[in-house]
């Protein structure tokens, strides 16, 4: 069976490198980009199985990029990896075409499970409660 082909979009290289380490050798990273416009170009050119993207990026944000990819017929599944834990962001991302939403503090714990669920056609939304935010 061939490896899942992933395009990674985040404007913080340290975070992208961490995600790549979490994924390990079980996946093929076919591209890494650092802004939404580059995400559009790479996704249409490379047709990844899965796109892992941030919301807040320069040039074009991740939500608008994913919305545009859907309009252009890109079949790639999308999981957002973001600092935004607000439910409004989750709804907006799902409406734009995302199948997954992980808040960055939960990436190490949730990413591999999220990928399996999303590739199986299910929605995955990570939880991030007050205890994890240090608010409890």
Where are these regions (language model features)?
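Receiver (REC) domain active-site loop signature in two-component systems and cognate sites
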Residues: 57
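Short, flexible helix-to-coil linker/hinge segments that flank and couple to helix-turn-helix
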Residues: 90-94, 100-136
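Acidic catalytic/metal-coordinating carboxylates
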Residues: 35-38, 61-64
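Two-component/phosphorelay signaling modules centered on CheY-like receiver
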Residues: 13-31
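Short acidic/polar segment at the start of the alpha1 helix of CheY-like receiver
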Residues: 12-16, 89, 125
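Active-site beta3 strand of CheY-like receiver
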Residues: 46-52
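Conserved sequence signature across two-component system core domains
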Residues: 9-10, 33, 51
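Active-site residues of response regulator receiver
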Residues: 54, 82
């Amino acid at each position: 069976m061939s490896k899942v082909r992933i395009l990674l979009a985040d404007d913080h290289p340290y975070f992208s490198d961490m995600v790549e380490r979490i994924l390990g050798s079980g996946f093929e990273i076919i591209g890494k980009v650092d802004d939404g416009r580059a995400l559009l170009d790479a996704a249409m050119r490379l047709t990844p199985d899965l796109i892992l993207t941030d919301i807040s990026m320069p040039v074009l944000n991740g939500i608008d990029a994913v919305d545009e990819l859907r309009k252009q017929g890109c079949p790639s599944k999308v999981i957002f990896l973001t600092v935004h834990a607000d439910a409004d962001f989750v709804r907006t991302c799902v409406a734009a075409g995302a199948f997954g939403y992980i808040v960055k503090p939960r990436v190490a714990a949730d990413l591999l499970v999220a990928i399996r669920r999303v590739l199986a056609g299910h929605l995955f939304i990570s939880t991030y409660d007050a205890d994890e935010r240090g608010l409890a």
